[in-house]
Amino acid sequence: AGIKQERDQAKYDKAKKLASEINKIKDRIVKDMQDKNSKIRRISTACYLIYRTAMRVGDEKDPEEADTVGATTLRKEHVNLTGSSIEFDFLGKDSVRWQETVQAVGHDKQFHDNLKELVLKKKNSDEIFDGITSRHVNQYYSSIVEGLTAKVFRTYLASSVVSKYLREHDSIKKSNPAEKLYHAKLANLEAAMMCNHKRTIPKT
């Protein structure tokens, strides 16, 4: 347990440092989604998917975990592309259903176009990012920021949701300890929902 705590602490410490690097990371991913090299396009599109939805990487799991669908193991049947949106629907970790719709506007339009290209001529049971694994994703992330991995990135995305919630509810600093705890739980719930973890609404 102690080793896991140390690993988690290191992950959180790295995630905290990402706040100042996030624009650099996003800009590089967006640029590479238009690269002429198809492998770079595939890797950066998988990385954008994780950035955009906080989805797990897919083929990276603890020994006691069952195989689950994630970014690199996503199949054509898990994604529905309309003219203006991307709809995800699949069972993720702990058999929790992951449903999310991303509108194809701004950078998400390039994301939509890349996915459209990737699913072309594929069967429903085919993986969208064929040939791309967590190793490729993590190598790509760490080429932008040293030590950055998909797990660290998801930790950053979750912690930024918590920080945003607490900033928006700044008045709770004057609240009693029970109210503070309740809001802390709500903030964590929002982060858990973004990461598609199983969580229940805290009791008051």
Residue spans for each PLM region:
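Extended accessory and catalytic-adjacent subdomains in large enzymes
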Residues: G2-T204
